[in-house]
Amino acid sequence: MLNRTILVGRLTRDPELRTTQSGVNVASFTLAVNRTFTNAQGEREADFINIIVFKKQAENVNKYLSKGSLAGVDGRLQTRNYENKEGQRVYVTEVIADSIQFLEPKNSNDTQQDLYQQQVQQTRGQSQYSNNKPVKDNPFANANGPIEIDDNDLPF
């Protein structure tokens, strides 16, 4: 059987970090995920999905994500239930995240922004190292059209 959920969306609120009685960090947040179709008014609707993440990833989510951040979530769907104060059974469906991808840099964190800028500079061929050796050019930069590769050239 398979229970796998992959989502990309924006946080609707800042993550909430707490620690269980056994000392495990848990973060929760809601992800707004646009539907692939439009409604009768031509507007795209969204689903608001509760996400739970544990341990070190919970700390990272709390540190680097905030309301409006774009994130990718890979996890599994889980339904739990409890009895509320009125004695009614309440069912809650949420995604238990195995992996969270931060899909954009956090602007309020200068360190993260600096890292992003370094990555951008490196992709433009500017070295961050002080040895001033030239960066080798991309050997495929001037390739026009498809590259012919024989099956015998492949290592697998």
From Swiss-Prot:
One of its GO terms (cellular component) is nucleoid. The keyword Cell membrane does not apply. SUPFAM superfamilies: Nucleic acid-binding proteins. One of its GO terms (biological process) is DNA replication. PROSITE patterns: SSB (PS50935). The keyword Zinc does not apply. Residues 112-128 have a biased composition (Low complexity). Residues 107-156 are annotated as: Disordered. Residues 1-104 form the SSB domain. Keywords: DNA-binding. It comes from the Bacteria. One of its GO terms (molecular function) is single-stranded DNA binding. NCBIfam families: ssb. Homotetramer. This is Single-stranded DNA-binding protein. It comes from Staphylococcus aureus (strain N315).
